């Protein structure tokens, strides 16, 4: 239910968002805009006795001349509330690529780094019902499915920090009304009127839909309905994964007969989860590529998807890392390899972690005894000193070394139910 109500009702609504398990330290991301300024002031009223310690951060992207003064505005207001504040500067824009996407990534990276430095377990973001509705409209334009139309989750984990959106049930107008009634200043970002951006187009389209009874409230309710549908689909995908898969040296083995009886949507979700877990891609593969991989699986053909090989013949379908995806990946000894592998062993002079490769596998006389196929092992992690192979634990050449998944095998299943 959306709220367009008074100050105390807003405070009560926010307090209820944290009543089950309030964090000891709660970060608040405040840009200086009306939504986030209102969030900061309302949270300060939620916890007046300091039962939850609030910390405020402002990300200054350095892209507009006004950004420094907006950060200063937040700093002054935070100080007036007795809250610590830090401005986080982004200097990574090179003028190339997608500015909005890069700025968003930088913003979340800076916020989670700041939170971890300050022992802040949870960060509150000021997305509103209007943001949710606009997101849904934009995703409709991309032919999104259930997960896309669920729009923004009220809670998710990123880089070890919980991000919460306690204002998804609150309208932008309600927050502005609160600020005006309390005489609290905020800054208006001129880009909010720039129709070059899809979000602003969606905002204008939303206003045009109002005569049909389609407003932020209705669309936010649709997003909530889709979120519940997504949870159900995730649950049945989880059950299918438990029933049909097992982990083998970081690869996923899938029982083909059971997979071919799954409903199309569950099969698609399971495929995407396996590929994402192994390949670690930031974005899911394109729809056409997914459809081709599903067709190959159903017809017992091998294929490639998202940096993974799918070996489709035999009693078990094997999903493994694709050699080409890790061919040039080299990190120092002690670092995480391919975003998932931790290798431990004796210190090696000039030690490096690389993909084993065909040449390296020739130096592993017992690799066939592992039961893993050639294609999987050449993309497995190994330890090198210059041109000398030191160890390849998954290929039967341990030499005192182990290779383990950073998150453990159980993460494959647990991550199906976490957003």
Swiss-Prot record:
Its main location: cytoplasm. One of its GO terms (cellular component) is cytoplasm. Keywords: ATP-binding, Cytoplasm, Ligase, Nucleotide-binding, tRNA processing. Gene3D superfamilies: HUPs. Transmembrane segments: none annotated. Pfam families: ATP_bind_3 (PF01171). It comes from the Bacteria. InterPro entries: Rossmann-like_a/b/a_fold, TilS/TtcA_N, tRNA_Ile_lys_synt, tRNA_Ile_lys_synt_N. Belongs to the tRNA(Ile)-lysidine synthase family. This is tRNA(Ile)-lysidine synthase. It comes from Ruegeria pomeroyi (strain ATCC 700808 / DSM 15171 / DSS-3) (Silicibacter pomeroyi).
